[in-house]
From Swiss-Prot:
It comes from Stutzerimonas stutzeri (strain A1501) (Pseudomonas stutzeri). It holds the Pfam family Dala_Dala_lig_C. Mg(2+) 2 binds at E274, N276. One of its GO terms (biological process) is peptidoglycan biosynthetic process. Residues 112-307 form the ATP-grasp domain. Keywords: ATP-binding, Cell shape, Cell wall biogenesis/degradation, Cytoplasm, Ligase, Magnesium, Manganese, Metal-binding, Nucleotide-binding, Peptidoglycan synthesis. This is D-alanine--D-alanine ligase. InterPro entries: ATP-grasp, ATP_grasp_subdomain_1, D-Ala_lig_Van_CS, D_ala_D_ala, Dala_Dala_lig_C, Dala_Dala_lig_N, PreATP-grasp_dom_sf. Pathway: Cell wall biogenesis; peptidoglycan biosynthesis.
């Protein structure tokens, strides 16, 4: 396991391209994350510059001198293995998880299937492709339910539903974002998020919001979202949450850094929702918050993440 705080001379990283923006539905969040990461690297003395990953990305990668890349692209095209594959073909080391883990974590259905195969708890679910599927899912799972695109992040396209009519409407709305739509059991209870850095689990964060769930507005826009560190669990339950989150990351093959989202039901049981391989790095973001609780400021955090690109030998 690597030390959390980098001890390298910033010049060892060479010329670093911070990749952000892109074309996914999470572009605006990525722009903010990328700006924060770029500013922190430059302030630390790293020779870093930004690339908005658009149509000219291939040209930029071939024309610029790039010693390594810091990926801050959220969602499709950056978090799903495609950018990782492109960088590997170009021979450019990069931060975070590799191709397989990135692609798997971006696919909520297959991530759940991996967890289920290992006996890790995740809510019961069904795949929706028609109104008939909606009817069948309602009978199998009951209400309330939550509908989500299978390959989106930041809670984009998600909706809580309480009857079949709402389920059909939510499926249609989610289908605008993804050809594959999931519906899951609604877990009533507190939500937690757990950051993992170089295999070490950072202090879990308890989340509270007056919204129906921790949606896009609660994540990035609202001023009334509550973040609890310590998370509010007793020592034994917090340790169980940390162990489960570490196992969830190990199952997917996470490298470097990630964030796991977890619910707790009324009986105290934990349920894995998803794992994010390129979590947000904005002023509202959770990984920087957890890092601060572990004694790392934002600059130390980004250097630690970048350190992994040297250690991993992508």
């Amino acid at each position: 396991m690597m030390a959390l705080q980098s001890t390298r001379d910033p010049k060892e990283f060479g010329r670093v391209a911070v990749l952000f923006g892109g074309k996914s539905a999470e572009r605006e969040v990525s722009l903010k994350s990328g700006a924060a990461v770029l500013a922190a690297l430059q302030a630390a003395g790293v020779d870093a510059f930004g690339i908005d990953a658009g149509d000219d990305l291939l040209q930029r990668l071939s024309s610029e001198r790039i010693d390594r890349a810091f990926i801050v692209l959220h969602g499709r095209g950056g978090e799903d293995g495609s950018m990782q594959g492109l960088l590997e073909c170009a021979g450019i080391p990069y931060t975070g998880s590799g191709i397989l883990a990135s692609a798997l974590a971006m696919d909520k259905l297959r991530t759940k299937q991996v967890w289920q195969s290992l006996g890790l708890p995740t809510p019961r679910h069904a795949v929706l492709a028609s109104e008939v599927d909606c009817q069948a899912a309602a009978q199998m799972l009951g209400f309330p339910l939550i509908v989500k695109p299978a390959h989106e992040g930041s809670s984009i396209g998600m909706a809580k539903v309480g009857d079949v009519a709402e389920l059909i409407a939510a499926w249609r709305a989610a289908s605008a974002y993804d050809a594959q739509v999931l519906v899951e059991q609604w877990i009533q209870g507190p939500e937690f998020t757990v950051a993992v850095l170089h295999g070490e689990v950072l202090p879990p964060i308890g989340l509270g919001t007056p919204h129906t769930f921790y949606d896009y507005d609660a994540k990035y826009l609202a001023s009334d979202t509550q973040y609890r560190i310590p998370c509010g669990l007793d020592a034994a339950r917090e340790e169980a949450l940390k162990v489960l989150s570490a196992r969830a990351c190990e199952a997917v093959g996470i490298r470097g850094w990630a964030r796991v989202d977890v619910m707790q039901d009324a009986e105290g049981n934990f349920w894995l929702l998803e794992v994010n391989t390129v979590p947000g790095m904005t002023d509202h973001s959770l990984v920087p918050m957890a890092a601060r609780a572990a004694g790392l400021d934002f600059q130390q955090l980004v250097l630690s993440i970048l350190d992994d690109s040297l250690e991993a030998g992508n």
